[in-house]
Amino acid sequence: MQGQAQQQAYDRGITIFSPDGRLYQVEYAREAVKRGTASVGIRTPDGIVLAADKRSRSPLMEPTSVEKIHKTDDHVGIASAGHVADARQLIDFARRQAQVNRLRYGEPVGIETLTKNVTDNIQQYTQVGGARPFGVALLIGGIEDGSPRLYETDPSGTPYEWKAVSIGADRSDLQEHLEENYTEELSLDEGVGLALRTIAISNDDELTAAGVDVATVASDTEEFIELTNDEISAYIADNDLEPAEETDSE
């Protein structure tokens, strides 16, 4: 009973390490990320690709009300997995940081600088009493000094830079697919195709344009662009991800 009581104390105390050096609330926040639908980020020489599974919970839900990818500044976007409300708070914070940088220095914020500002904010919520960690992971992708940069944040407040990465549900399967198929010579179009094929692994239903968000940031224009449903449908068709047509059996 005493051991169980000690376990509960470490569970409830966000700022208390367990005897084996664990912060249980941060670990639980990571579990919340795993319950979210998948998002994928891919870095290519031509730019950044962000894709996110945004399947709605009901056919009555308006698909446009589900947002998984957000424009943060002209040259950077963020995809999320986990608690949507937590993601919204962090994305609003990131947007404010980007605006402050433009007002103060007259130039776009660096992707690495923006990521570290966001992760510093996340990390504070692992040390402050009366709060809880953010139950969300983010992919922050954009162009910095003409070069594509792609970062992941997790609930501990740790930033990681990647060439290709997935967050959310079925991460191990999606990451394995990326490791097997990613090359550093991918074009931006090929990156979109790889991102959609990766998302399809986590999607039990057929992949549709209404069920996925895709955005790119090209190196030459440094412009964040969200793909339209028609453009996504064309990529789905080009990558043989369309639902198979049913044939009548005699």
Swiss-Prot record:
Subcellular location: Cytoplasm
Name this polypeptide is given: Proteasome subunit alpha
GO MF, one example: threonine-type endopeptidase activity
Family (UniProt): Belongs to the peptidase T1A family.
Subunit structure, interactors included: The 20S proteasome core is composed of 14 alpha and 14 beta subunits that assemble into four stacked heptameric rings, resulting in a barrel-shaped structure. The two inner rings, each composed of seven catalytic beta subunits, are sandwiched by two outer rings, each composed of seven alpha subunits. The catalytic chamber with the active sites is on the inside of the barrel. Has a gated structure, the ends of the cylinder being occluded by the N-termini of the alpha-subunits. Is capped at one or both ends by the proteasome regulatory ATPase, PAN.
HAMAP family linked: Proteasome_A_A
GO biological process terms, semicolon-separated: proteasomal protein catabolic process; ubiquitin-dependent protein catabolic process
Keywords: Cytoplasm, Proteasome
Database matches in Gene3D superfamilies: Glutamine Phosphoribosylpyrophosphate, subunit 1, domain 1
Predominant subcellular localization, coarse grouping: cytoplasm
Domain of life, source organism: Archaea
One protein family per Pfam: Proteasome
An annotated GO cellular component: proteasome core complex, alpha-subunit complex
Record text on activity regulation: The formation of the proteasomal ATPase PAN-20S proteasome complex, via the docking of the C-termini of PAN into the intersubunit pockets in the alpha-rings, triggers opening of the gate for substrate entry. Interconversion between the open-gate and close-gate conformations leads to a dynamic regulation of the 20S proteasome proteolysis activity.
Role: Component of the proteasome core, a large protease complex with broad specificity involved in protein degradation.
UniProt cross-references to CDD domains, sorted A to Z: proteasome_alpha_archeal
